[in-house]
């Protein structure tokens, strides 16, 4: 193999550390650093390092220099040249670059792009919304009930992430970014996301576009002062590996975050060759991605590269040649700590040009990596806010920290400042003596939740319809009204549950029908207002998530959505130990539909005396009255597994679980013919309470209960429970699940149309003038129900 002549782009502590590690390799003959700093400057003829006075984004001069010096490997350090496309410039002249393309660098260059990528690839992160319009962002922020983080979309020199303490500060930050252009074009778009709480973790991962290998997990200290106080900085210190990152946690991060990220980038056409920096928050719900960078982190690099025992140059070559899987990466079992020394005043205004002096380091495991330094008149002087880092390795975190701070004492410059508590999270004695509590050992399984999402994704996607892609995992479901053919509709919403029918499902361990009930109870309430159901969202709450039960439930929801023609665009699965016991769960649904302004039902002005009431047959009890049903079953001494008294071919419970009939498509068929005046969904309250809900104040309804055959289930319930007829009428649908009001001259046509699409329809009553003391819905021939 020919000797490697490397061109390293950058001038920070990260670049000094990379150059130092590269120079340990026998493969390296020279490392040019452009522009470099006081630590990378040549210190003699034997030195492999040499600074080159070319800016990091002066691509023309960098390429010319590389060609002149026979450079055969380029390693960009900072983010700006990567985002600006440095990789492409060197690719065009045939020089391999250990860094991503401009397309892949969008993962760091655009917060909006990276968050959308996470959403597309089901990578766990904070809920978010992005905006290019200030007024829209302000309106959203005004509705937020959670603490937020506001992020400028583009690169903002590490200052574009703002964590407001109050809503007032949040509005001020938004105005500063989007209106006052504090970060210039970087703030043209913003991301507003939920503030996550927990411990942060940074993981640097080598990637060849397919294979990925991670360095030890590190923990940075962003705040300027001890105790994580003060303003944000570029990083005041770092240690690795961090004890909070257990092997199990790292396996989870690898399988749910890092590998899916590498795979997702390749699948989307911009594979990552280089370093993936993943910033994580360890929340009670599991690890969540805060950000991606596409280069070595700073000061993480200063802490983790000293732990790398393998040849860095060999690893980088394996990445650019797409054969990372062919080499082993060996990591020291030691610990590392890097303490950053900064100029007085940092991260605010600070002096440059102060002379730095160094005493001899007392331990061979201690190193100094320069950052904001330069050489002037033979002296090393300050040339930036973060001046240098003192790093040390030891057999424990405590040993590494002690050696690093001993090394800090050998560095001297005017107004030098550093934090005194680097690695305090690991050294906190309370952490060592107290039991570690996690979300999982409190009763909530994050892994189960993630597996549940994976199981139902394809089911959910099967409900796609024009206007909605039925993709889950985002902040909210989106529906495109125009794509669905609506121009200026009114939106109609409904929310409902299934009720105690769920207890029968639990008794039989049969959960695939109650999801249909959930959809039906919502969409039937929409269609009676003339609305076409467009989207549905479900809420499933339980004490401990049973994957089989929850998946079966969602299968039912999907069936219901398909019957109704609406898209399942999202939902919430809530695991609440202590609130639900013995496998119990509850469910709620919400549906949104659309109706043209002129087609809203009922149409009160169109009703008249003599209008006909048509009844559409129900499929049984549907979803109301189950508290009474269960009490009757209890009194009957039957079990839900007993043979059904009115159908010897099924169990009692199976018959009672027959789902609510969904009337949407047949009713929309006749609604669009403009012959329907109003409709009533017969739920709790029966005919006597639901039919009046569609009537104008001057009309009443008369319904003849002898015009249809009451299903056997209601006959059994009445007899087994000795239930008065008046209670039966006000509790159950008694065989009529939907009532439609039409003009007398349209009754036959309507019945024919509904029958042609599979409905059983009865002519059950008519409208009459209201009398002062009369019932709004009077049932005649009730005596027929006495003699079932």
From Swiss-Prot:
SMART domains: GARS_A (SM01209), GARS_C (SM01210)
Requisite cofactors: Mg(2+); Mn(2+)
Annotated localization: Cytoplasm, Cytosol
Gene3D superfamilies associated with the record: 3.40.50.20, ATP-grasp fold, A domain, ATP-grasp fold, B domain, Phosphoribosylglycinamide synthetase, C-terminal domain, PurM-like C-terminal domain, PurM-like, N-terminal domain
Keyword tags: ATP-binding, Cytoplasm, Ligase, Magnesium, Manganese, Metal-binding, Multifunctional enzyme, Nucleotide-binding, Purine biosynthesis
Keyword Lyase belongs to the record: no
Stretch list, region GARS: 1-430
GO biological process: 'de novo' IMP biosynthetic process; adenine biosynthetic process; purine nucleobase biosynthetic process; purine nucleotide biosynthetic process
Annotated binding of Mg(2+), by residue: 291, 293
InterPro entries assigned: ATP-grasp (IPR011761), ATP_grasp_subdomain_1 (IPR013815), PreATP-grasp_dom_sf (IPR016185), PRibGlycinamid_synth_ATP-grasp (IPR020561), PRibGlycinamide_synth (IPR000115), PRibGlycinamide_synth_C-dom (IPR020560), PRibGlycinamide_synth_C_sf (IPR037123), PRibGlycinamide_synth_CS (IPR020559)
Cellular component terms per the entry's GO annotation: cytosol
Known catalytic reactions: 5-phospho-beta-D-ribosylamine + glycine + ATP = N(1)-(5-phospho-beta-D-ribosyl)glycinamide + ADP + phosphate + H(+); 2-formamido-N(1)-(5-O-phospho-beta-D-ribosyl)acetamidine + ATP = 5-amino-1-(5-phospho-beta-D-ribosyl)imidazole + ADP + phosphate + H(+)
Top-level class of the enzyme under EC nomenclature: ligase
UniProt KW Kinase keyword: no
Family: In the N-terminal section; belongs to the GARS family.
PANTHER family linked: TRIFUNCTIONAL PURINE BIOSYNTHETIC PROTEIN ADENOSINE-3, TRIFUNCTIONAL PURINE BIOSYNTHETIC PROTEIN ADENOSINE-3-RELATED
Role of this protein: Catalyzes the second and fifth step in the 'de novo' purine biosynthesis pathway; contains phosphoribosylamine--glycine ligase (GARS) and phosphoribosylformylglycinamidine cyclo-ligase (AIRS) activities.
The protein's name in its UniProt record: Bifunctional purine biosynthetic protein ADE1
Gene (name only): ade1
């Amino acid at each position: 193999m020919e000797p490697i002549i490397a061109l390293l782009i950058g001038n920070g502590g990260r670049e000094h550390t990379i150059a130092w590690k590269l120079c340990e390799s026998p493969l390296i003959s020279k490392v040019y650093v452009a522009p470099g700093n006081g630590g990378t400057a040549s210190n003699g003829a034997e030195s492999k390092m040499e600074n080159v006075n070319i800016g990091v984004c002066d691509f023309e001069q960098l390429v010319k220099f590389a060609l002149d010096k026979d450079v055969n490997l380029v390693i960009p350090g900072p983010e700006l040249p990567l985002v600006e496309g440095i990789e492409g410039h060197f690719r065009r002249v045939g020089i391999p670059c250990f860094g991503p393309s401009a397309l892949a660098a969008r993962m760091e260059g655009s917060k909006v792009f990276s968050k959308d990528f996470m959403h597309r690839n089901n990578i766990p992160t904070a809920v978010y919304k992005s905006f290019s319009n200030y007024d829209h962002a302000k309106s959203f922020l005004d509705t937020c009930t959670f603490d937020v983080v506001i992020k400028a979309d583009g690169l903002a020199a590490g200052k574009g992430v703002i964590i407001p303490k109050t809503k007032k500060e949040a509005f001020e930050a938004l105005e500063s970014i989007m209106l006052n252009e504090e970060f210039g074009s970087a703030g043209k778009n913003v991301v507003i996301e939920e503030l996550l709480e927990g411990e942060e973790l940074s993981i640097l991962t080598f990637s060849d576009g397919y294979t990925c290998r991670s360095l030890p997990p590190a923990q940075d200290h962003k705040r300027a002062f001890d105790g994580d106080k003060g303003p944000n900085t570029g990083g005041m210190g770092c240690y690795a590996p961090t004890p909070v990152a257990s092997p199990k946690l790292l396996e989870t991060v690898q399988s749910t975050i890092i590998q899916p990220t590498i795979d997702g980038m390749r699948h989307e056409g911009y594979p990552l060759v280089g370093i993936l920096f993943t910033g994580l928050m360890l929340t009670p719900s599991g690890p969540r991605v805060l950000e991606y960078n596409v280069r070595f982190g700073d000061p993480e690099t200063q802490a983790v590269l000293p732990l790398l025992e393998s040849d860095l140059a060999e690893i980088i070559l394996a990445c650019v040649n797409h054969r990372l899987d062919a080499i082993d990466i060996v990591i020291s079992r030691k610990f590392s700590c890097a303490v950053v020394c900064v100029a007085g005043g940092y991260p605010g205004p600070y002096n440059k040009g102060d002379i730095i002096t160094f005493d001899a380091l007392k331990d061979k495991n201690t190193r100094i990596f320069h950052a904001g330094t330069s050489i002037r008149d033979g002296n090393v002087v300050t040339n930036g806010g973060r001046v240098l880092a003192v790093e040390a390795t030891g057999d424990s975190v405590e040993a590494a920290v002690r050696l690093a701070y001993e090394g800090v004492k050998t560095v001297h410059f005017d107004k030098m400042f550093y934090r005194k508590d680097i690695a305090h999270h690991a050294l906190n004695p309370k952490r060592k003596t107290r039991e570690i509590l996690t979300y999982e050992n409190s009763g909530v399984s994050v892994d189960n939740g993630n597996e549940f999402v994976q199981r139902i994704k394809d089911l959910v996607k099967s409900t796609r319809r024009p206007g909605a892609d039925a993709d889950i995992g985002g902040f909210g479901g989106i529906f495109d009204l125009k794509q669905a053919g609506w121009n200026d509709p009114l939106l109609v919403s409904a929310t409902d549950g299934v009720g105690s029918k769920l207890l029968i499902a639990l008794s039989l361990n049969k959960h695939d029908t109650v999801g249909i009930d959930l959809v039906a109870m919502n969409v039937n309430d929409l269609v009676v207002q003339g609305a076409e159901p467009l989207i549905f969202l479900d809420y499933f709450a339980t004490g401990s998530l049973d994957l089989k039960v929850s998946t079966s439930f969602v299968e039912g929801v999907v069936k219901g959505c398909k019957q109704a023609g609406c898209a399942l665009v999202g939902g919430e699965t809530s695991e609440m130990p202590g609130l639900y016991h013995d496998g119990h769960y509850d469910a709620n649904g919400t549906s949104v539909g659309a109706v043209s302004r002129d087609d809203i039902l009922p149409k009160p002005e169109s009703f008249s005396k003599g209008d006909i009431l048509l009844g559409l047959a129900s499929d049984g009890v549907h979803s109301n009255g189950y508290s009474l049903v269960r009490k009757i079953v209890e009194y009957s001494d039957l079990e839900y597994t007993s043979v059904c008294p009115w159908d010897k071919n099924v169990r009692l419970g199976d018959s009672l679980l027959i789902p609510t009939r969904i009337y949407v498509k047949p009713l929309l068929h006749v609604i669009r013919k403009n012959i329907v005046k109003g409709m009533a969904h017969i739920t709790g309250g029966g005919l006597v309470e639901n039919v009046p809900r569609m009537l104008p104040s001057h009309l009443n309804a008369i319904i003849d209960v002898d015009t249809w055959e009451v299903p056997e289930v209601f006959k059994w319930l009445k007899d087994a429970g000795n239930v008065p007829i008046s209670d039966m009428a006000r509790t159950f649908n008694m065989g009529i699940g939907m009532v439609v009001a039409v003009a007398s001259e349209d009754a036959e046509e309507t019945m024919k149309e509904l029958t042609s699409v599979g409905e059983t329809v009865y002519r059950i009553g008519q409208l009459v003038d209201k009398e002062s003391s009369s019932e709004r819905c009077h049932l005649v021939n009730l005596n027929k129900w006495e003699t079932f």
